[in-house]
């Protein structure tokens, strides 16, 4: 649990305190912020993610890693894009000549995602948006919404979630095919426990992507609620050819994942980790040289 989570879930657990804190944060939020060269539009009704971005404490290690590894010629698939932070970082990369596909089924977040995509200088047509949920099959799903944290919408009910919407879904392979994407060099998956479903529906894309960096949240509780298992998810990624690393929340430095079972055991309940999967000789050379320097 991070310091921010401790403050929000423990110190501000009483509803009157939380309501007051949320109101104060909302009043201070700007319409948009700069993260390096990127412009990110904020949801003014999201005190958690928008507040953390405004204060500069949101996913600092993950942002540092992304910025250090993303290349201007890469195709990036951003699954669970929210308001488009990582898509903006990609599009604003100096000399960008790749493509970005931002996938976000939450209709409210997508309003700000569209603004973010439009606000970052990139070649016409470089930034694409899909309103479908990436899953393992076509259909419709119920997305349960968190009113206080718009990045915590899930595909299963929970006491923290109030309100729901029906969203279209399809496999990641099909979504990418519709947008003319056959391979990706960088993929981010942050979908509150539905990560295994995404990967099951992406065998074609991941198989063809021989040089690939994959950033993924690893939350065994969420995976279980979506019908999967933490160890199964790790093995699934390894079977697809990814070498796994755990990403430091503070520094963004990846450390080899030596004991998957131990990781599962220490990420129970609300605890989670951020992982990086690396595939391909040139990608692995990059991380090895970084660790040696």
Indicate residue ranges for each PLM-predicted region.
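Phosphate/nucleotide-binding beta-alpha loop and adjacent structural elements of enzyme active sites
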Residues: 1-293
